[in-house]
């Protein structure tokens, strides 16, 4: 999840949003230095909050709004409306910034660097924060070295760059046809398990991300899997996930089997306690298989997640989605990264004055 509201964000909330922005823009070709230079400015402008109105004056479109405090807000809002996308939305605002890069908008080349050159630059985050301040934000007070400090902070305390290999969790089957939903009266009472059928018996489903088989239950015909890394979920959250596929027989893999995203993972089936060919699916937060529990029917022990919040349904045919909020995503899988620098998180207290940034004092673009 990301934080979108008309309030000043806390440190922990800003970090969630900043990490999302880093991941998103890395996968669109930006360097980590350029992203963090912009984040140093966003922190002062909006506390990295896409829902923030200048001075908390919600609806005053003559003032600033959003991550970079577009002023007047109506310029950005009208653009979003013309694009048919929600304006108070993280992805929409990042799309606007990418549009500005591609259309040479908003940027005044005051530091001998174009916007397209900026997003590819490997200058220091501090230098790039000052360039972004001068050429993009152009506030009433241009003397704000704190934005450079903030840019350096984000560079040192966010993980990844170039996407860090972050993959979108893709729904495993190419169709959605539900025969029993969450809290189903037949065998899902109290659980978030869902049963799916294919277009034929023994219908295939595929690995939603790079993953490893961590448990095999022959008597009940199930395999448990964990993601090898954190994944981007359909609801925008980044987390490890663990799930079970139930009813294929015989089971096709042993514990320790590794699959790449898109590899064949299994088929619908009639193994275990079953009344017809289908696939029973259940997912929890985290990377540890903890066995099963009863709620009162059986499900994975741990924090269950809604399948429709975890797995994006890009290019999936929905025949019967049971009315659930299935989501597509614009996320593009990362292709690696430098692993970031996570060893300076203890400096948070030293930077608390930075986090009470001049966004609280009304600076605006």
UniProtKB/Swiss-Prot annotation:
Zn(2+) binds at residues 188, 195, 280. Its EC number is 3.2.1.-, 3.4.-.-. GO terms for cellular component: virion component. SUPFAM superfamilies: Duplicated hybrid motif. Its cofactor is Zn(2+). Substrate binds at residues 45, 71, 106, 137-140. Residues 1-159 are annotated as: Lysozyme-like glycosidase. The keyword Hydrolase applies. One of its GO terms (molecular function) is hydrolase activity, acting on glycosyl bonds. It is an enzyme of class 3 (hydrolase). Its main location: virion. Binds 1 zinc ion per subunit. Residues 160-165 are annotated as: Linker. The active site is at residue 45. It comes from the Viruses. GO terms for biological process: cell wall organization; defense response to bacterium; killing of cells of another organism; proteolysis; symbiont entry into host cell via disruption of host cell envelope; symbiont entry into host cell via disruption of host cell wall peptidoglycan; viral tail assembly. Keywords: Antimicrobial, Bacteriolytic enzyme, Cell wall biogenesis/degradation, Degradation of host cell envelope components during virus entry, Degradation of host peptidoglycans during virus entry, Glycosidase, Hydrolase, Late protein, Metal-binding, Metalloprotease, Multifunctional enzyme, Protease, Viral release from host cell, Viral tail assembly, Virion, Virus entry into host cell, Zinc. Residues 166-365 are annotated as: Probable metalloendopeptidase. InterPro entries: Dup_hybrid_motif (IPR011055), Phage_lysozyme2 (IPR041219). In the N-terminal section; belongs to the glycosyl hydrolase 24 family. In the C-terminal section; belongs to the peptidase M23B family. May serve as a plug to restrain the highly pressurized packaged genome and thus would be the first virion protein to contact the host cell wall, degrading the peptidoglycan layer and thereby facilitating viral genome entry into the host bacteria. Acts probably as a multifunctional enzyme that degrades N-acetylglucosamine polymers (in vitro) and cleaves the peptide cross-links of the host cell wall. Essential for the tail assembly. This is Morphogenesis protein 1. It comes from Bacillus phage PZA. The lineage of its organism: Viruses, Duplodnaviria, Heunggongvirae, Uroviricota, Caudoviricetes.
